[in-house]
Amino acid sequence: MSWNISHPQLSDKLFGKNGVLEEQKSPGFKKRETEVYVGNLPLDISKEEILYLLKDFNPLDVHKIQNGCKCFAFVDLGSMQKVTLAIQELNGKLFHKRKLFVNTSKRPPKRTPDMIQQPRAPLVLEKASGEGFGKTAAIIQLAPKAPVDLCETEKLRAAFFAVPLEMRGSFLVLLLRECFRDLSWLALIHSVRGEAGLLVTSIVPKTPFFWAMHVTEALHQNMQALFSTLAQAEEQQPYLEGSTVMRGTRCLAEYHLGDYGHAWNRCWVLDRVDTWAVVMFIDFGQLATIPVQSLRSLDSDDFWTIPPLTQPFMLEKDILSSYEVVHRILKGKITGALNSAVTAPASNLAVVPPLLPLGCLQQAAA
């Protein structure tokens, strides 16, 4: 079954001009203190995916190296501070079921034994009670019983997909309750079914998960009202004092829409590291790391009456492997909420209370 992606005119109408994603190219490779080493990468990873992995740190350049069954990269982040922050946030993080090894580029890091993983037996699935997109989901294939070499392991990797942190109930319950005082609109989301057009705002690469806006007349009206209000308020809203920025702060920050330009958008502070804040852009379903001094105040409830424009979805059968789908319309059928979960203590996954349905989209045939 193939994608049914509409022409970009509708997304242009909502966002502006048509944007084209371009891969940054390296004029030459030279190790610098502003570069970060990213090791234990999948063999088939592209430069574009590496840049996306470090998108929160505004990477300038990437140099990918593949040696036999090993793949690693050096990424220029532009400053030593960003290198330190990237190491803190990404080292040890699971990426395509591989533990990333992130370090400075001063010397090649030693390969640790826990980085060499043999195929594991499938995790145990259990039925989750209720509905909610705070569930941890898994799609699993049987792993081979006999040991294989690392090259063969790359080809036989199990298709395991866990609901990302920002889509889980433990995160969203806190976010929505602190941002929106009136949650009566939640009932409408539970009732959404049938044929739909979804304007994709962000994806989780090589998984079935993505954030999208359900294209309706109501969405168009909400977008116009919200963006008009934020545009008028932006210059009047003061920048936040550094001491007031903490987890749970409602604020306004500049969101990058690629070639579409920039837009000030509602966001919620998830964490703070020195002079950097990790924020969730409410209306685009996107996490980003931005300077604390660039945040503006947006604590009045008047700015939080319009529900979030976007929500998470999961494809029933396919995965998203191309970034070209971002800012495009996907057409398909919303079949319901995700209703299965996985118990996997070793992988630090947890079943959490339901809140909203993680919409399951059945792709339309081409």
Swiss-Prot record:
| InterPro entries according to UniProt | Nucleotide-bd_a/b_plait_sf (IPR012677), RBD_domain_sf (IPR035979), RRM_dom (IPR000504), RRM_TDRD10 (IPR047385), SNase_OB-fold_sf (IPR035437), Tudor (IPR002999)
Q: Where is the Tudor domain?
A: 210-317
Task: Give the source's domain of life in one word.
Answer: Eukaryota
Which SMART domains does its entry note? RRM
The record's PROSITE patterns line, in alphabetical order, gives: RRM
Domain RRM: start-end pairs: 34-107
Gene Ontology CC terms, in alphabetical order: membrane; mitochondrion
Q: Which Pfam families match?
A: RRM_1, TUDOR
Q: Which UniProt keywords apply?
A: Coiled coil, RNA-binding
- Does the UniProt entry include the keyword RNA-binding? yes
Tell me which positions the record assigns to the signal sequence. none
Gene Ontology molecular function: any one: RNA binding
Q: Which residues form a coiled coil?
A: 216-237
Asked if the record carries the keyword Amino-acid biosynthesis, the reply is no
Q: What is this protein called?
A: Tudor domain-containing protein 10
Which species is the source of this protein? Homo sapiens (Human)
